[in-house]
Amino acid sequence: MSNFQFAIPTIDYIRILPEIVLAVFGIVVMMADALIPQNNSKKPLGYLSLIGVLVSLGAIACQARYPGMYDVNNGTGFWGMVHVDSFSLFFHVLIALITAAVLLVSFEYMDVQRMRSGEYYAIILFSALGMMLMTSATELVLIFIALEISSIGSYVLAAMRRRVAESAESSLKYFLLGSFATAFFLYGVALIFGATGSTNVYTIAAALQNMHPLQPIIYLAVALMFIGLGFKVAAAPFHVWTPDVYEGAPSPIVALMSTGPKAAAFAVLLRVLFAMNAPGWFWIVWVSAALSMTIGNIGALVQSNVKRLLAYSSIAHAGYMLVAFAAAKDAGISAAIFYTATYAAMNVGAFAVVSHFANTGEKYVTLEDYAGLGRRSPLLAAILTVFLLSLIGIPVTGGFFAKFYVFTSALQSHLVWLTIIGVINSAVGAYYYLRIIVYMYMRDEREEVPVARMPFGLALALAMCLMFTIYLGVLPTQFINYALKSAQDLVR
């Protein structure tokens, strides 16, 4: 009789330490919620959740310093299902910072909207857990599980404004369409497994290299997986849910779902397309990038609701990121990483301002409501202006170098037409961002719209986003070098 032993090496737990921290704090928050009376403020649970995110950042720092963590041969854990490298650590830190900023914005929002749901904070932590696990998973089944953890949390968070019909409607649309998209991804995984006999990204890559000729089913599998992940990043033509969901969901949650899941899904796309060396992906990405930029910018031109405008803007920016994907070289991958981080900072900041200005019931969300904001609240208007200029790509902001890096990498890969489409769309996009600025500084308000005092949590979140946006616009070299190292770690 053979002696069968089932043991997980200690280092494996270190590889998922940030996720373990978030899971523990999420459970603690739910237990603590049961001890707080229903009608009391749940802000203490928000503070506890923020502590959990900070502890997870400490766990990420421990991962980065752990001996042998980056070793190519021993760099995986849980039998090759999880891999921690510069690439995954970068996205872990990014997701943790996004989550921290959203929690800071949520403190005020929950009180102003009179939402007494303690599970709100726990679900944010569990969603962040799923996003982090997506970025380090090298097993397609584990990626699917992490994707579902993140998605289910997002569906629930979108419906947190329970008494508002638009919120329930947006959540239902998100759930139904998200379920279809996930089914496409899972079917693609099943086809890949049927063709290669594995669901491990690196094992699949080796199998595809030895498969001559490639089975046609491989191309179908890659297309199906791209559909599933394209939905998560709000790339055209899988974008139809975005405006309605962003309009109906709570503004802090829109800040989260427009950046966190997008960053995690882009990380998975990078790992699946490049590390797996998936065939047939180039033209899929090319077409989706062109459609996303064009549909997103044209759709935003006719919007009067700021949340819907930023939703279409999010679709357009997904297109810019996909331009970097199409470039396919180290420079293209690093440009996609750099753009993802820059976009997260400026978009979270923009939605933080929208969340604060919307007031009780999210009443003030139209362009007319922003008229005269420069006189009524000069600081808030100035901060929003910086984020909008960065979204345009004006110099001295992170958005400028992000777009410059993306288009440069595309030209280096001879993607001339895609670059031309991107530049034209950037010029079109400048119109609707400047339109908001014109309303804030050059239009008189039709009625007095109140602007509440900026609370400390919101001020801290805005300061984080503002400093990061300006830092990447003034001193981007160090960050670009790290993005390049992350790209090299991914494809080595």
Curated annotation (Swiss-Prot):
UniProt protein name:
NADH-quinone oxidoreductase subunit N 2
Q: Which GO terms describe its biological process?
A: ATP synthesis coupled electron transport
Q: Which stretches are transmembrane?
A: 16-36, 44-64, 87-107, 118-138, 140-160, 175-195, 216-236, 250-270, 282-302, 309-329, 333-353, 381-401, 416-438, 455-475
**PANTHER family from the entry?**
NADH DEHYDROGENASE
**What InterPro entries does the annotation carry?**
NADH-Q_OxRdtase_suN/2, ND/Mrp_TM
Q: What is its subcellular localisation?
A: Cell inner membrane
Function according to Swiss-Prot or TrEMBL = NDH-1 shuttles electrons from NADH, via FMN and iron-sulfur (Fe-S) centers, to quinones in the respiratory chain. The immediate electron acceptor for the enzyme in this species is believed to be ubiquinone. Couples the redox reaction to proton translocation (for every two electrons transferred, four hydrogen ions are translocated across the cytoplasmic membrane), and thus conserves the redox energy in a proton gradient.
Membership in a protein family: Belongs to the complex I subunit 2 family.
Q: How does it assemble?
A: NDH-1 is composed of 14 different subunits. Subunits NuoA, H, J, K, L, M, N constitute the membrane sector of the complex.
Its chief place of residence is membrane
Query: One GO MF term, please?
Result: NADH dehydrogenase (ubiquinone) activity
- Quote the EC number: 7.1.1.-
One cellular component term (GO) for this entry is: plasma membrane
> Does Translocase show up as a keyword for this record?
yes
**Which reactions does this protein catalyse?**
a quinone + NADH + 5 H(+)(in) = a quinol + NAD(+) + 4 H(+)(out)
* Entry keywords, A to Z: Cell inner membrane, Cell membrane, Membrane, NAD, Quinone, Translocase, Transmembrane, Transmembrane helix, Transport, Ubiquinone
Q: How does it sit in the membrane?
A: Multi-pass membrane protein
Q: Does the keyword ATP-binding apply?
A: no
